[in-house]
Amino acid sequence: MKIRTPVVAAALYLAAALPAFAQQAPSLYKRLGGYDAIAAVTDDFLGRLSTDTQFSRFFGGHSADSIKQLRQHVVDQLCAATGGPCVYTGRPMKTSHAGLGITEKDWDASVKDLVATLDKFSVPAKEKDEVLTMVSTLKKDIVEKP
């Protein structure tokens, strides 16, 4: 019985320490600053797109309510994709962008605007790369023309 006591004590000590070892790294959502930070980045990014002459054909003629809905969908999508608590309820990207005639040139310009936004908010390189990698997976569903 005396031999088991140190073994049990050691096992209990290790078991108590396990939660510290099991902790995961913070999600991209948390590292970006959470919901408010993602919303601010979205506002800046959509502002850049809406004032960029290359994208005027996509934003012209939309009501303020339509733009608000687009904004919320983008916030929810980024929030969910980065590990946050949001749920994206919008349409699939392919459906949302079908028929818009988005080109490679449009894609490249939008990525440039996104990088400028991330730089404005001083997003660290690691997180910026993660966001850009995540966004790049959407390209196949958004770009319709070379």
Locate the predicted segments by residue:
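Core of compact, soluble alpha-helical bundle domains
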Residues: A22-P146
